[in-house]
Amino acid sequence: MKQYIFSALCLVSGAFCLSSGNDDKEARAYTPVYEIVPEYTNADTWKAYEAFNEHLLDQNKFIYKSSTADKAAVDRWNGAAAIWCQPTYWDMAMNAYKRAKAEGDTQKEQKFKQLCDDLLAGNKAHYANFDFDDNNENTGWFIYDDIMWWTVTLARAYELFGVEEYLSLSEESFGRVWYGSEKVGDTGSYADPEKGLGGGMFWQWQPIKNPNPNEADHGKMACINFPTVVAALTLYNNVPTGRTESTDSHPSYQTKEQYLAKGKEIYAWAVENLVDVTTGQVADSRHGNGNPAWKDHVYNQASYIGASVLLYKATGEKQYLDNAVMAADYTMNTISGTFDLLPFETGAEQGIYTAVFAQYIAMLVYDCDQTQYIPFVKRNINYGWANRDQTRNLCGGEYHKAQIEGATIDSYSASGIPALMLLFPADK
C-alpha cells in the first residue's frame, strides 16, 4: 500500500505547487482517480493459485476447463479450454513448482511437481497423444500457432525437469510447424524468401484437410512469428552442442546453430514487418505487402518482449534489450493507459493475454534487471486481487471491477492475476 499512498501524496503536492503559481485558479487538492487498495501477500499467491485449480482444472483429465460453468473438459466444444492456452496453464504449474522450491516448502514443491507431471500426461492423452500430424479439429492440431505455443512450453519443461521426452516433443513440433507435414500435406509455416514467399511465418494452412500451399500474400501473424523466435531460442539454450545437421526434408531436430539462425531470421523479418520501432507497438498481422494491422494485443507485445530478451541473452547485443524495453513501455504507458492496468479484451480466449505477459515481463525484469516494471505489475495484481470473487478467491479479467460472487468466470480471464503472482513475490 505504501507505493499508492506515496504516489497519491506526490500528486497532491504537485497539485498544490501548480495551484500556487496560478492566482486565477482556485487552489484545490488533487483527488486520486483510484481508490487505494491493499497490497497482496505471498500467502495470497497460494490462495489465488489453489482457487484457480480448484474451480477450473478438470481433476479427472488434468486439462483445464473453459469456465466455471463447465463440469468437465470433454473436448473443444464441450468444456475444454483452448488447445493453445493449455500450455500457459502448464507454465503456471511449473512456476508454482519453482516458487515453492525457492520458498523451501517441500510439501508444495512435491505437490506442484506432481501437478506438472499430471498436466503433461492429461494433455498428451487428450490431444491425440501429441501426434502433431493429427489435424482433427476437435482434439488435434490444425493451426500453426497452436502447435508453436506447445513447442515453447515443452522446451521450458525440458529446461526445468530434464525429461528427454519433453525435448523430443518440442523439437518434433518445431519441425512440424517449420517444414509442414507430409501426412497432412501442408507446406509449412516458414515463408521461404528463396521461394518467393517473402519471409516470416504463416499463421495457418487452408483448407485444414487437403490444404493448398501458402502464398506470399497470406496472413503472417505476430502470434506465430514471435513465439517461433521464443521457441527457437529456448531450444538453442537446451539442445546439445556438436550435432550434425539433418539432411531429411522434414528434420525432427536442428543443431544449436540452426536454432539461433532461425530465431534471428524470423525476428528480423517480424520487427521489420510487424513492429513500429519508434514506439514499440506490435501489429497483429500483415498480408503480403499490405499495411500491417495495427491492432494492439497484450500477448503480441509479450511474445515480442520474450523474443527480444532471449536474443539479448544469447548474443549480448543491446538492440534486442532496447526493443524489449520499448515494447514493455508501450504496453505499460499506452495500451494500459485507461486505468493504468492491463486492458481486458472480450474476445474468446483473450483473457489469457495477461498470463502470457506475466511469463515474459518476468524475464525482462529478473533476467535483464529491468525492475522499473515491478510497480506496474504489482498495481495490476493488487487491483485484480482486491476485486476478486471473495467467496471463491477467483479473479476476473477486468481488474478495476469487482467480480460478482458466484458468476461464471472463464479460465482465461481467471489466469492472469495468479500467473503474475507466481512470478512476482510480494516482498521483492
Give the positions of each predicted feature.
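Bacterial Sec-dependent N-terminal signal peptides
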Residues: 1, 7, 14-39
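CBM-like carbohydrate-recognition segments
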Residues: 30-145, 160, 180, 184-193, ...
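Residue-level detector of extended alpha-helical repeat arrays and alpha-solenoid scaffolds
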Residues: 86, 147-150, 167, 225, ...
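Mobile, glycine-rich extracellular loop/lid and propeptide segments
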Residues: 141-154, 161-164, 169-173, 177, ...
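Aromatic- and acid-rich polysaccharide-binding/catalytic face
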Residues: 148, 226-227, 231, 298-310, ...
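Aromatic- and glycine-enriched pocket-lining scaffold segments that form the walls
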Residues: 167, 171-265, 269
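Noncatalytic carbohydrate-binding groove/subsite architecture in carbohydrate-active enzymes
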Residues: 226-227, 231-295, 302, 307, ...
